């Protein structure tokens, strides 16, 4: 899911436990206006919502964390080292074996198993670190006590209450991150209502406990953001002697094409037409710049988290998982073969 830089999130998450929570004053005019809005727009009973907000806790430490200057982004070789560990790869293989059927089923949407695994591995270590805050506390705190982004978080609070009603959840029960991201794949409420899928067919979308729902929802999110079955995510490139004038590194848009990059002298091996959208990515390696070319599926991953580093880490972890655990052959309908960075070179 799109959210703040991972390292800034981690630092802020640690800080949120230092200040005590205080009861939210549900009689505040802004809270009462929100309750009236929910009643008018969506038919909620004001008295029932008032009882819910009477039990909500505002957390000043969350506001303090949001106000803290963003942590400097780590260079690629340090960022990658956080996610490409033996422990994370081994846990991913273990998860793949335990959840083979949910993975197989979700992959029928056209997203290979290793990418579904990799996103859950990067987001929450395969469900181990899904957050410890009540979602309603986090969202209400940011909706009513953090003016710079109050509009956004009031919208997410609205979506969360609708989600809770649709899924027959006690709105005081779900837990997640300090910013309100939920479950194993860390969906915000708007994303949950838009892209979460009932993968196991039980009538509910459970991103905390159902791996069928988790993997199907991640696959649906990526497909809805442009993922193309059978196409590569990214390949390594050689930019030695290439004309890189005018290229804006760090941008997420696919502003070039396979053909235009080759015309500049960038060397890479991929079986895509010259007209295929592409972006040249420069990463800070241990021995100097590393160049890669990202394609439409790379861009789809950046819709989950708007960072080239994030999408590159997901791609590398997916490749490592595929090497450590050979995904079983797909049953009908057949998914296209996985294309890794190394196999495309």
Label every model-predicted segment.
Residues 171, 175-286:
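Flexible, glycine-rich surface segments
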Residues 1-9:
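Bacterial N-terminal signal peptides that target proteins for export
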Residues 81-94, 143-146, 150-151, 193-209, ...:
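Substrate-binding clefts and substrate-entry loops adjacent to catalytic sites
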Residues 30, 41, 237-345:
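C-terminal soluble interaction/assembly domains
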Residues 24-107:
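An acidic, Gly/Ser/Thr/Pro-rich helix-cap/linker signature
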Residues 16-20:
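N-terminal signal peptide c-region/cleavage motif recognized by signal peptidases
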Residues 50-58, 112-127, 160-165, 218-219:
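Short, functionally critical alpha-helical segments immediately adjacent to catalytic or ligand/cofactor-binding
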Residues 58-65, 124-134, 145-150, 166-172, ...:
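Secretory-pathway/luminal and periplasmic proteins that interact with or process carbohydrate-rich
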């Amino acid at each position: 899911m799109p959210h703040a830089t991972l390292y800034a999130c981690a630092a802020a998450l640690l800080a949120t436990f230092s200040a005590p929570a205080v009861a939210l004053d549900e009689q505040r005019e802004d809270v009462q206006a929100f309750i009236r809005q929910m009643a008018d727009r969506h038919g909620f009973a004001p008295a029932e919502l008032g009882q819910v907000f009477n039990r909500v806790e505002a957390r000043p430490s969350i506001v303090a964390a949001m106000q803290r200057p963003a942590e400097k982004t780590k260079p690629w070789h340090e960022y990658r080292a956080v996610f490409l560990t033996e422990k994370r790869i081994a846990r991913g293989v273990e998860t793949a074996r335990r959840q083979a059927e949910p993975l197989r089923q979700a992959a029928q949407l056209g997203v290979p198993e290793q990418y579904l695994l990799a996103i859950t591995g990067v987001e929450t270590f395969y469900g181990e670190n899904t957050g410890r805050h009540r979602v309603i506390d986090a969202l209400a705190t940011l909706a009513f006590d953090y003016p710079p982004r109050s509009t956004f978080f009031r919208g997410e609070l609205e979506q969360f209450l609708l989600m809770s009603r649709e899924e027959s959840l006690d709105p005081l029960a779900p837990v997640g991150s300090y910013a309100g991201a939920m479950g194993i794949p860390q969906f915000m409420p708007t994303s949950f209502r838009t892209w979460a899928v009932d993968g196991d067919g039980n009538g509910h979308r459970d991103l905390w406990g159902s791996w069928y729902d988790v993997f199907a929802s991640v696959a649906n999110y990526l497909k809805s953001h442009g993922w193309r079955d059978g196409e590569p995510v990214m390949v390594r490139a050689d930019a030695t002697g290439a004309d890189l004038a005018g290229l804006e590194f760090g941008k997420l848009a696919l502003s070039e094409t396979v053909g235009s990059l080759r015309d500049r002298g960038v060397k890479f091996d991929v079986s895509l037409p010259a007209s295929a959208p592409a972006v040249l990515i420069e990463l800070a390696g241990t021995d100097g710049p590393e160049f890669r070319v990202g394609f439409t599926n790379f861009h789809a991953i950046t819709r989950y988290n708007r960072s080239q580093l994030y999408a590159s880490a997901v791609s590398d972890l997916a490749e490592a998982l595929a090497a450590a655990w050979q995904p079983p052959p797909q049953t009908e309908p057949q998914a296209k073969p996985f294309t890794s960075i190394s196999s495309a070179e």
